[in-house]
């Protein structure tokens, strides 16, 4: 026996509910604690799936993957994002599926990069770039390739890819997220090249733009880069900056930002304030283990064996 047909009014209500769920999820991902996005986006996926709205399912799934990754739930993020690749890679893929396949490849690359797997990340960024038909998607992959090169110590490649990414956002002042991320990578490249002053300038610009965009997670990451640059420059403000980064990251429950901010702060305070140093290092270890808990076994072992991570447990 077939179900009763859905009325026009019910259909409109469902569409409004779906739009609200997507907007709520996107707002939390980029302007609040990312964990607050998860429930709304899971409901959006279910509602869109019931209605056969594949584009909305894909958009919500990508946002869900970003939210999970931002909180350090990398295993969950990869589980959500990986199925979005293949549908966008077929020859007759719809433009929106191709777009989200490219964005998902860049997001998967970011997960691997955060785990220190820069060569793997480069493969996914290249895969995403091959699919990129829009400036937005191409930017994410180009900037990812620059960050991959930083992690691999390839300063010339990093700068070249960064400049290509910069060309894609030239004159697009409304693209706050892309511009903030570009300044992060500018700071990373400057640090790789040993130019702490340039890194401070880039990180400060990222913080200012993120604050103006009401994007606290992006503020926290900008503060992390700023604090590291200040350490390299011998700036006494580094301790204050890193405390701000760590405290904000903890309030957002963004473990990928908590652990490096706490680790650097703990090392910095080892002589001047051993008690705070110990607390900070303990918080870094807790965040590292929180990330490890959501990883597949082989990746977990690799993560915990990473030199800067392993050093936390040897101290």
Regions found by a protein language model. Give the residues of each.
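C-terminal non-catalytic interaction modules
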Residues: 1-39, 43, 240, 244-315
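N-terminal membrane-targeting/anchoring modules of bacterial envelope and secretion proteins
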Residues: 7-11, 15-18, 22-31, 35-37, ...
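Alpha-solenoid helical repeat architecture
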Residues: 10-19, 51-63, 92-107, 133-144, ...
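Structural motif corresponding to the intra-repeat A-B loop/turn of tetratricopeptide repeats
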Residues: 31, 51, 71, 115, ...
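TPR-repeat structural position
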Residues: 34-35, 54, 74, 118, ...
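Amphipathic alpha-helical segments of tetratricopeptide repeats
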Residues: 42-49, 78, 82-93, 122, ...
């Amino acid at each position: 026996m077939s179900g009763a047909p859905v009325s026009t009014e019910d259909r409109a209500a469902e569409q409004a509910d779906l739009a609200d769920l997507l907007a709520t999820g996107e707002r939390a991902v980029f302007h609040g604690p990312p964990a607050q996005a998860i429930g709304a986006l899971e409901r959006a996926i279910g509602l869109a799936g019931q209605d056969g709205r594949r584009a909305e399912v894909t958009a919500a799934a990508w946002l869900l993957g970003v939210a999970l990754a931002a909180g350090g739930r990398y295993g969950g993020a990869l589980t959500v994002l990986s199925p979005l690749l293949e549908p966008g890679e077929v020859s007759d893929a719809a433009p929106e599926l191709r777009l989200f396949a490219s964005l998902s490849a860049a997001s998967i690359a970011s997960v691997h990069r955060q785990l220190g797997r820069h060569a793997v990340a480069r493969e996914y960024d290249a895969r995403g770039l091959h699919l990129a038909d829009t400036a937005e998607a191409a930017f994410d992959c180009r900037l990812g390739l620059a960050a991959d090169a930083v992690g691999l110590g390839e300063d010339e490649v990093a700068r070249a890819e960064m400049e290509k990414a910069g060309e894609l956002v030239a004159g697009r002042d409304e693209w706050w997220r892309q511009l903030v991320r570009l300044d992060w990578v500018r700071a990373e490249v400057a640090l790789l090249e040993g130019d702490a002053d340039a890194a401070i300038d880039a990180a400060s610009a990222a913080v200012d733009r993120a604050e103006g965009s009401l994007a606290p997670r992006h503020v926290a990451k900008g503060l992390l880069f700023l604090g590291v640059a200040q350490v390299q420059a011998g700036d006494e403000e580094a301790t204050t900056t890193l405390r701000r980064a760590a405290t904000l990251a903890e309030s957002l429950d963004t473990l990928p930002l908590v652990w490096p901010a706490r680790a650097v702060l703990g090392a910095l305070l080892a002589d001047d304030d051993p008690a705070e140093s110990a607390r900070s290092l303990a918080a870094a270890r807790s965040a590292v283990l929180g990330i490890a808990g959501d990883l597949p076994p082989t990746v977990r072992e690799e993560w915990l064996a990473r030199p800067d991570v392993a050093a936390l447990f040897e101290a």
